[in-house]
Amino acid sequence: MTEPSNADIAVMSFEDALKQLEKIVDDLERGDVPLEESIRIYERGEALKKHCDTLLKSAEDKVEKIRIGRDGQPVGTEPLDPE
């Protein structure tokens, strides 16, 4: 079975990228993958992790906190404070 090139990662959803990343981690933890294959899938895993991080950061940037006025009614939004 041939793995897709890393070029396909850019169009993956977060869920698909995470699923592939989890499979790569499982395969590497099993320890029965040949060295060359381990290196190749590790590099793909790095690209998947970077893509997931980018998607999470983008989602985080879109999340806003609703501001409540003294009367208890919403008065607007502001960026969510990073933790």
From Swiss-Prot:
GO CC terms: cytosol; exodeoxyribonuclease VII complex
Pfam families: Exonuc_VII_S (PF02609)
Keywords of the record: Cytoplasm, Exonuclease, Hydrolase, Nuclease
Top-level taxon of the source organism: Bacteria
GO molecular function terms attached to this record: exodeoxyribonuclease VII activity
Subcellular location, record wording: Cytoplasm
Catalytic activity: Exonucleolytic cleavage in either 5'- to 3'- or 3'- to 5'-direction to yield nucleoside 5'-phosphates
GO biological process: DNA catabolic process
Family from the record: Belongs to the XseB family.
Assembly: Heterooligomer composed of large and small subunits.
Protein name: Exodeoxyribonuclease 7 small subunit
Gene name per UniProt: xseB
